[in-house]
A protein has these predicted regions:
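Glycine-rich Rossmann NAD(P)(H)-binding loop
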Residues: 208-213, 240-247, 258-262, 270, ...
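NAD(P)H-binding glycine-rich loop region in Rossmannoid oxidoreductase-like domains
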Residues: 65-129, 133-136, 148-152
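Glycine/proline-rich active-site loop of Rossmann-fold NAD(P)-dependent oxidoreductases
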Residues: 186-194, 230-240, 246, 262-265
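A hydrophobic C-terminal alpha-helical subdomain
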Residues: 273-354
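Flexible, glycine-rich beta-alpha linker
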Residues: 156, 179-196
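Substrate-positioning beta->alpha
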Residues: 190-192, 210-231, 238-241, 252
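Conserved Rossmann-fold NAD(P)-dependent oxidoreductase catalytic core, especially the SDR/UDP-sugar
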Residues: 56, 109-110, 116-172, 176-182
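N-terminal Rossmann NAD(P)H-binding glycine-rich loop of SDR-like oxidoreductase domains
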Residues: 33-55
Length: 354
């Protein structure tokens, strides 16, 4: 004997089938983004936003076993693919362009390494390769992440390679949009987190160029909002300077971080010869805190030049302020953590208890 099939089970089957068909049609209409540098703070944030807006994403990584979990958890299943490849393996990279609508390059380095990771290779030759492939495969868009202040920093190898990369991109794919952000920060960065670690441990901290260098730090989420806007509004052939809502000197930045982690430290202006010597020493380390090239770069302000449109002028103003955002995650470096007793209990109350 068999049990009779209920009408409700039949209805649920057809409902599920219809929903599945609608989902497949929805995903078939989605655009495909190819992202290089997707495992970093900017890449992860961008993946979350693009996939929520029905973009399918392919992320290229050097080590799939190391980065797979970090990347896959940024999006729902079906919206993200991960490909392991060397970025200079043209045969493998070329195959990815056959099913791509938009290419986004977020790869960049702050210091050179011996095994091929030079400024020229990463910032100039690789973007040039991507731009040529974008043109060859008729991609709708290519978004390339560069850096702010590179026109002025003529004695910095980092800046020269970034500028050369921009020129190569526009030469090979004139429709490309180039973003020049100031310092990008978030809970996942290597900027504020490293500085707070050092300020937490060192009683004295050096000020290079008297701490007068100006920055316009932009939160990672504001930057990815800009990228998302550029894609959705089809903004082409532009250089866009991406800055935060405020200009802060290096000294002011350190003072804000010290206030947030509730520390008092002596900020000492470093003479240039001593700064150069310390940079040469740090270069001997695998991950140097400062290099000679970075020291040269620190001479120049990292703010909008006024020569190009900014993220605000294309309709996406930065809304996140440095101190307000860092306050959300700085407690990891503050004595007593998020619920520091001394911070929250008034002296009057402590006296009454005692």
């Amino acid at each position: 004997n068999t049990l009779p099939k209920s009408k409700s089970s039949g209805k649920s089957f057809w409902c599920n089938l219809i929903l599945l068909l609608i989902l497949n049609i929805y995903m078939m209409n989605s655009k495909h983004c190819l992202i290089f540098g997707g495992s970093g703070q900017i890449g992860r944030n961008l993946i979350r936003k693009l996939t929520k807006n029905n973009y399918r994403v392919t992320v290229v990584t050097r080590n799939i076993h190391q980065k797979s979990y970090i990347i896959k958890t940024q999006a729902n299943a079906g919206y993200i693919d991960i490909v392991e490849a060397n970025i200079f393996d043209e045969k493998k990279i070329r195959a990815l362009f056959k099913k791509t609508d938009i290419c986004i390059n977020l790869i960049g380095i702050l210091f050179e390494q011996k095994k091929g990771n030079t400024f020229k290779n990463i910032h100039s030759i690789f973007p040039s390769l991507l731009a040529k492939l974008c043109k060859e495969y008729n991609l709708k868009h290519f978004i390339h992440l560069s850096a702010l202040g590179i026109n002025d920093a003529v004695d910095s190898e980092y800046a020269k390679s970034k500028l050369e990369g921009e020129n190569n991109v526009l030469k090979n794919f004139p429709l490309a949009t180039i973003l020049r952000p100031s310092i990008v920060y978030s809970v996942d960065d290597n900027f504020t987190t490293n500085f707070m670690t050092l300020l937490n441990r060192l009683p004295i901290f050096p000020l290079y160029y008297e701490g007068k260098t100006k920055f316009a730090p932009i939160h990672c989420s504001d930057l990815t909002d800009t990228i998302n806007h550029i894609i959705s509004k089809n903004i082409y052939s532009k250089i866009i300077e991406c800055t935060g809502p405020e200009i802060i000197s290096f000294k002011e930045l350190l003072q804000k971080l010290l206030y947030l982690i509730n520390k008092k430290r002596i900020l000492v202006p470093f003479p240039l010869p001593l700064a150069k010597f310390s940079a040469q020493f740090f270069e001997l380390l695998p991950n140097p805190l400062l290099t000679s090239d970075q020291l040269r770069l620190l001479k120049y302000d990292n703010i909008s030049s006024g020569k190009y449109k900014t993220n605000s002028e294309i309709g996406i103003p930065s809304v996140r302020y440095f101190e307000e955002e860092v306050k959300k995650y700085c407690y990891m470096w503050r004595e007593g953590g998020q619920f520091s007793t001394e911070k929250y209990i008034s002296k009057d109350l402590q006296n009454k208890i005692n």
